[in-house]
């Protein structure tokens, strides 16, 4: 499995829900910060986005706005709209809702937004989410000039929202995973910075090392064995990895192992020794020491507090 595919496995995208927001005149809504990927697809009209970190963007009919890490944001009819009494649409999410929420004042100026929320594991997904911008804007996604993969993907999303069939939830999760992956691919293809964790995902050699780390964290990896995955010398691999990922191969490996350990402490019934073995530590003592250095508490105490 390639690096990007394995990292998307780690994110555990699930429980995708959607709703339609029908707007007219002066309108606004907001969404609180949450552990979720948020996608707004502008089907008609336009929308102005303001994120908690100050990022702003205006999107038009046919555009997609992706909020990868679920940052709190405010959406309105234009940048000048300072409405205080705006709707928190999170309360309207209820699985798959096809009856539109209506917002705004009486006007001939109509709009329609298809909003999707997919829950994700923010901790396991942190390398990807931290590397992505807080907002990704895909222009003209549904026009004839838009990427073909996106038009086809959105067609299937639209089709699935109109059907009530067994397996619908799972299919919709898969469709949202595809949409997210393609948006990330599109973003990486347009990156100006050749030295970032995102470009390492597509690097012909380094991506092999990342895939190996994420697929087999329990293996006793060394710089040499990771270099072998890339068919490179130890020194060349170590230098290239550091220059693009901005940390050493073994530091990256340890961070991934500890992220996985946190997930297992929260979600599994494995004991501490079993978790240590599963994430590549030869002893419970070595694992506990590394965990405590990172989180300033023992694995046992962390599990009790979770």
Curated annotation (Swiss-Prot):
Keyword set, alphabetical order: DNA-binding, Transcription, Transcription regulation
Pfam families: Cupin_6 (PF12852), HTH_18 (PF12833)
UniProt DNA-binding residue ranges: 224-245, 272-295
The keyword Ribonucleoprotein appears for this protein: no
Entry keyword Transcription regulation: yes
SUPFAM superfamilies: Homeodomain-like, RmlC-like cupins
Gene Ontology MF terms: DNA-binding transcription factor activity; sequence-specific DNA binding
Pathway linked to the protein: Hydrocarbon metabolism; alkane degradation
Domain HTH araC/xylS-type span(s) in chain numbering: 207-305
GO biological process: alkane catabolic process
Domain of life from the UniProt record: Bacteria
PANTHER family associated with the record: ARAC FAMILY TRANSCRIPTIONAL REGULATOR, HTH-TYPE TRANSCRIPTIONAL ACTIVATOR RHAS-RELATED
Function per UniProt: This protein activates the expression of the alkane 1-monooxygenase AlkM.
The protein's name: HTH-type transcriptional regulator AlkR
Organism for this UniProt entry: Acinetobacter baylyi (strain ATCC 33305 / BD413 / ADP1)
């Amino acid at each position: 499995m390639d690096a990007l595919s394995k990292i998307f496995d780690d994110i555990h995208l699930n429980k995708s829900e959607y709703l339609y927001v029908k707007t007219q005149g002066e309108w606004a809504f907001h969404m609180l910060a949450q552990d979720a990927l948020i996608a707004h697809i502008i089907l008609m009209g336009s929308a102005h986005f303001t994120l908690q970190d100050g990022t702003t963007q205006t999107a038009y009919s046919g555009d997609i706005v992706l909020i990868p890490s679920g940052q709190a944001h405010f959406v309105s009819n234009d940048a000048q709209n300072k409405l205080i009494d705006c709707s928190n649409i999170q309360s309207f999410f209820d699985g798959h809702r096809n009856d539109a929420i209506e917002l705004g004042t009486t006007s001939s100026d109509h709009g329609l937004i298809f909003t999707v929320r997919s829950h994700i594991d923010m901790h396991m997904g942190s390398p990807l989410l931290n590397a992505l911008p807080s907002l990704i804007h895909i222009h003209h996604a549904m026009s004839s000039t838009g990427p073909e993969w996106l038009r086809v993907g959105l067609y299937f999303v639209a089709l699935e929202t109109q059907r009530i069939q067994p397996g619908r939830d799972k299919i919709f999760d898969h469709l949202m995973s595809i949409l997210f992956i393609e948006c990330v691919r599109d973003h990486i293809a347009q990156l100006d910075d050749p030295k970032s964790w995102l470009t390492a995902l597509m690097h012909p050699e380094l991506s092999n090392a990342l895939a190996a780390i994420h697929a087999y964290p329990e293996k006793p990896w060394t710089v040499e064995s990771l270099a072998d995955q890339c068919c490179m010398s130890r020194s060349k691999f170590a230098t290239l990895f550091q220059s693009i990922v901005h940390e050493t191969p073994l530091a990256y490996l340890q961070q991934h192992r500890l992220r996985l350990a946190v997930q297992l402490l929260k979600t599994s019934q494995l004991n501490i020794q079993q978790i240590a073995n599963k994430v590549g530590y030869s002893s419970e003592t070595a694992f506990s020491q590394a965990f405590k250095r990172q989180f300033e508490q023992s694995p046992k105490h962390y599990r009790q507090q979770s």
